[in-house]
Regions:
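Basic, polar low-complexity surface loops/patches
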Residues: 4-155
Length: 155
């Protein structure tokens, strides 16, 4: 048992959390502590930044929130903490709703995809400007090109 928890994979962590949604499982990772998926959802009222990572080994996005030990100590107050080797569990103050969790999960992923598309548009715009053959174009062609860029930016 001791050895198993020293080498927990991300699959082990999300499975442990999924099996008991009355608790928030918090895992020590380096100097920070993380809660995954349902655990992050149960702490959503704290407004921590949610990180999303696609994990190839489980072919899915995993949502997590991370925080230092000082935050963990505050979270432990009034939550009946149970300590284990590399993680702890805290009693949740709210009742878990699968429907609300799935809605929150999808919203988090949609928000990241919107941010990624903004970055892609900015990158595409910079790339377009960088690669435009200004020296080989007439002033009228340059004017038309700038007008198209303005239209693209104003969308």
């Amino acid at each position: 048992r001791f050895f198993f928890f020293l080498i927990m994979t991300i699959l082990d962590k999300v499975t442990l959390q999924r099996q008991d949604t009355t608790k928030i499982f918090i895992f020590k990772e380096g100097v920070f502590y993380k809660a995954y998926n349902e655990g992050a959802f149960l702490l959503k009222d704290k407004n921590y930044k949610v990180a999303i990572k696609h994990i190839k080994s489980i072919e899915n996005e995993v949502l997590s929130i991370g925080f230092p030990i000082s935050v963990l100590e505050k979270l432990k107050e009034n939550r009946q903490p149970e300590e284990y080797d590399n993680y702890c569990s805290l009693q949740s103050n709210i009742v878990f709703s699968l429907l609300l969790y799935e809605e929150w999960y999808q919203n988090q992923i949609a928000n990241i995809k919107r941010e990624d598309s903004k970055y892609l548009e900015e990158y595409t715009l910079k790339d377009t400007i960088k690669n435009y053959p200004l020296a080989n174009k007439t002033p009228i062609e340059d004017f038309i090109w700038v007008a198209k860029l303005q239209k693209l930016i104003s969308k």
